[in-house]
Amino acid sequence: GFPVPDPFIWDASFKTFYDDLDNQHKQLFQAILTQGNVGGATAGDNAYACLVAHFLFEEAAMQVAKYGGYGAHKAAHEEFLGKVKGGSADAAYCKDWLTQHIKTIDFKYKGKL
């Protein structure tokens, strides 16, 4: 897989070239970084809320564009949210998942939304 940035900060290597999505990805990096540094329910709830909001926005953009990879992409989101909600996804897992997901799964929609 791709190396996880340390410190965990979004950089241009994560660009999808959709400003709304790139800005949301930046927010996810910040939320997961905060969760890992602070811990506790509040930081975790904030990260989860950011993930849900972003996934819904991204999935809606895929549906509007009739993007062919929508079903598999949505399933990946749901699997990840299940692990986060179930408590089996620590900060290191979340950082790695987001890094790999953006650079492999999200990059497939470049130029298609």
From Swiss-Prot:
Record: residues binding Fe cation 1: 25, 54, 58, 106
Subunit organization: Homotrimer.
UniProt cross-references to CDD domains, sorted A to Z: Hemerythrin
Annotated InterPro entries: Haemerythrin, Haemerythrin_Fe_BS, Hemerythrin, Hemerythrin-like_sf, Hemerythrin_metal-bd
MF term (GO), any: oxygen carrier activity
Family as reported in the entry's similarity comment: Belongs to the hemerythrin family.
Highest rank taxon of the organism: Eukaryota
Keyword set, alphabetical order: Iron, Metal-binding, Oxygen transport, Transport
Function, in words: Hemerythrin is a respiratory protein in blood cells of certain marine worms. The oxygen-binding site in each chain contains two iron atoms.
Protein name (database record): Hemerythrin
Binding site for Fe cation 2: 58, 73, 77, 101, 106
